[in-house]
Amino acid sequence: MPPSTELDALVDKIVNDHSLSEPGQSLKELGDNGKYIMDVQMKKLLKLHDQSFIERCFTPMEELKNRYAKVKERSGDLQKEAELVDRDIRIIEMAIQDINKNKSHQ
């Protein structure tokens, strides 16, 4: 049996040893890989996803909005024109009624 000082020295060596065992090395590599994935690859993936979302969803919707905003403006003009036509028809109808009244009184 080793003397207690030798035993103490071995225990100190084991406890204070900072070199990694094979499982410790594997665990460190996994941690480093996880950090790389979160710091680098996840940012790239989010940027790619954002760009893909913009191209597939936002841009087509923006184009539709721009296209149909023009139609909406024209339909607003159509509403005004319809109101003017309706007013003109009422004036014509009233004029016809007045003409018919004048004919019947003569």
Swiss-Prot record:
Location, primary (coarse class): other
Transport keyword on record: yes
Compartments reported by the entry: Endosome
Keyword list, A-Z: Endosome, Transport
GO terms classed as biological process: endosome organization; regulation of protein localization
GO cellular component, one term: BLOC-1 complex
Protein's UniProt keywords contain Hydrolase: no
Self-association state and partner proteins as the record states: Component of the biogenesis of lysosome-related organelles complex-1 (BLOC-1).
Job of this protein: Component of the biogenesis of lysosome-related organelles complex-1 (BLOC-1), a complex involved in endosomal cargo sorting.
Homology family: Belongs to the BLOC1S1 family.
Name of the protein in its database record: Biogenesis of lysosome-related organelles complex 1 subunit BLS1
Organism: Candida glabrata (strain ATCC 2001 / BCRC 20586 / JCM 3761 / NBRC 0622 / NRRL Y-65 / CBS 138)
